[in-house]
Amino acid sequence: AAYGNEAGVGEGIASSPVLRADVFLTTKLWNADHGYERALAAVDTSLRTLGTDYVDLYLIHWPLQDRDQLMRTWDAMEKILADGKAHSIGVCNFEPHHLQALIDRGGVLPAVDQVELHPHLQQRELREFAGEHGIAIESWSPLGGTSGSGWGPNSKPNTVLSDPTIGDIAAKYGRSPAQIVIAWHIRSG
């Protein structure tokens, strides 16, 4: 919702010859929409904007410092799942201690933790922890994000695809740096 792309995505799906059932559709609960009632209202808004009655994956965009509020939000996520408004639910940018809070709570575990993940940010501890609990890791920046300060005018160019080691490997195998990074992801699980 925060990216402002739901209307365009919905229009694209509606105008496409591809059936909705053949599209895996993910959207996110924005930070301002945490809490039980707000989360329930937010998914309904997203579904209306997307022009669909369900998403395949609904994600909490960012963990909250307030554990009680996070638990109320997760209660809403479970209801969204139970009501069929999402076929699976997950989180973004959660570290092991955030995931542990949901594990300790009991109930439905996140199907996915979507995080920045690439050869320069390998997230080994998180990947191991999530794997032990059956939580899939999905990269929101598989070819490398910006370096340094992240988003906006202070961000720096992607350094993964211009990494000399990745370039050397790409040259050795006659592939592009992007193909090498994708192969790394596949081999890393």
Regions found by a protein language model. Name each.
Residues 25-28, 114:
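Extended hydrophobic secondary-structure segments that form protein cores and membrane-embedded regions
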Residues 63-189:
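Beta/alpha (TIM)-barrel catalytic core signal, keyed to glycine-rich beta->alpha loops juxtaposed to Asp/Glu
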Residues 18-21, 50-53, 84, 108, ...:
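Structured loop/turn residues at beta-strand edges in well-structured enzyme cores
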